[in-house]
Amino acid sequence: MRLILLGPPGAGKGTQAQRIVEKHGIPQLSTGDMLRAAVAAGTEVGKRAKAVMDAGKLVSDDIVNAIVSERIDQPDCARGFILDGFPRTLVQADATEAMLKAKGLELSAVIEIKVDDAVLADRISGRYTCANCGAGYHDENLRPKVEGVCDRCGSTHFKRRADDNRETVVERLQVYYKETSPLIGYYYAKGKLQSVDGMADIEHVTANIEAILSKL
């Protein structure tokens, strides 16, 4: 089961990815986490990435693609994975397709979580995560079962992203619609796209995604 979740900031991709990980036992592959791990491990591609980052430059698509490729070869990805934050552009999508094909693999599905722009500001400004394990929560829609205690690891320390505020929502949406939303048409043309209504409550969104996954 090899998946990509698409949707604007605040659509609930992180929450749903977390639930897929817990239910199906496949890893969620975050480009940021993979970059840091490759640099820490001192792999060849990690050294290339470190040199670029130390110079204060953005890591190129070819380096990110190489790190994703390296990560997918790890044993815990044998049953599948969820790509988180990659691909973001059509160029990256083409590179991902070519990389998977070279390994004899293909994407199982690309799931688009559709949410109206009008509600995204409320969703984004209310988000926070466990500082220890990264579990996601929301002031209104997804509070811990015990107030102030993480459901997953029991930590009492939480944090909010600096850019999770109303002022940056418009800018982040503009970037999404310019760079990432073209992927919806790209994967639709390949017969991989599945859409779910992200305006529903979290449990209904999860159920709709599971209905899609059950047919893969």
UniProtKB/Swiss-Prot annotation:
Its EC number is 2.7.4.3
GO MF annotations for this entry? adenylate kinase activity; ATP binding; zinc ion binding
Q: What keywords appear on the UniProt entry?
A: ATP-binding, Cytoplasm, Kinase, Metal-binding, Nucleotide biosynthesis, Nucleotide-binding, Transferase, Zinc
A GO cellular component entry from the record? cytoplasm
Which pathway features in its UniProt record?
Answer: Purine metabolism; AMP biosynthesis via salvage pathway; AMP from ADP: step 1/1
UniProt catalytic activity:
AMP + ATP = 2 ADP
Spell out the PROSITE patterns in the cross-references: ADENYLATE_KINASE (PS00113)
- Which parts of this chain are annotated as the region LID? 126-163
Q: Where does AMP bind?
A: 31, 36, 57-59, 85-88, 92, 160, 172
About its domains, the entry says: Consists of three domains, a large central CORE domain and two small peripheral domains, NMPbind and LID, which undergo movements during catalysis. The LID domain closes over the site of phosphoryl transfer upon ATP binding. Assembling and dissambling the active center during each catalytic cycle provides an effective means to prevent ATP hydrolysis. Some bacteria have evolved a zinc-coordinating structure that stabilizes the LID domain.
Which family does the record assign? Belongs to the adenylate kinase family.
Function statement: Catalyzes the reversible transfer of the terminal phosphate group between ATP and AMP. Plays an important role in cellular energy homeostasis and in adenine nucleotide metabolism.
Assembly with partners or alone: Monomer.
**Protein name (database record):** Adenylate kinase
Identify the species of origin.
Rhizobium rhizogenes (strain K84 / ATCC BAA-868) (Agrobacterium radiobacter)
Q: What would be the name of the gene that encodes this protein?
A: adk
